[in-house]
Amino acid sequence: VSAASDVYKRQTHLYAVMYNWQQEPDIQVNNLAAQLSEYSGIIFVGDSRTYFMQKTLLREYGKDAVAKVSFVCKTGEGLSWFETAGERVMRSEIARLQSDSDKPVAVIFNLGVNDLSSHNSGNGVDYKGEANAYLARMNTLAEELESDCRLFYMSVNPVNTAMKPTRKEAQLRYFNDRLQSRLNKRFQWIDTYKYLMKNGYSTYNEFKGNIDDGVHYSTCTYKRIYKYCMNAIR
């Protein structure tokens, strides 16, 4: 390996820190949403990763901990689901929150990992085309939504490719870089990808028989992602 490529790998954190799920540090996040008094509510829009984050928080803390948080998500889905169903649910949730308060609503998107899976397409992924399709929809959305919606996009987070070879890290990074650089300026980027690659994560799904499927995270990792987001939207 040349010195130059070695430096590149170090800079882009190609060597992820992986935890044994039993040794991953645990944190408490049950009161984070309640502390965000500047928002009338927080909406996460995503796929199964968002769904399992919701399940983690409900199982660990109960409904009170996420009283201010809504989850608009569908497992196994991506942009086409958002356009045909998810956006409608998100908009009605925004309207509900705005009817009760004059404070802004925070909307955090975390879609993309399923549209970057060759398992879903049967052959190679047009990951550049997928990134452009996301940009087109999200940038239009930024023009349409009222100014009292605060928009955030959470990076597509790492996959353990040893367990899930249908997704490639380089394509995830391209997708993230493309969105981060070209999303409408109303979007604030939440770089949980870099945070997890640097600080560690565990792909261990306690809701699916404790399997490591390479895509879904441990309870501890989900809580750390949630905390990172809550801090990022302050």
Spans of features found by a protein language model:
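Charged helix-capping and loop-helix junction motifs
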Residues: 127-138, 169-175
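Hydrophobic/aromatic beta-strand patches that form the interior of the parallel beta-sheet core
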Residues: 43-45, 152, 188-190
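Catalytic His-Asp segment of secreted/periplasmic serine-dependent ester chemistry enzymes
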Residues: 159-234
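N-terminal low-complexity, Pro/Thr/Ser-rich intrinsically disordered segments
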Residues: 10-40
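Conserved SGNH/GDSL esterase-like catalytic core that processes O-acyl groups on lipids
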Residues: 36-129, 133
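Active-site segments of SGNH/GDSL-like serine hydrolases
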Residues: 110-114, 143-174
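Short, small-residue-biased leader/transition segments that mark boundaries at the very start
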Residues: 1-8
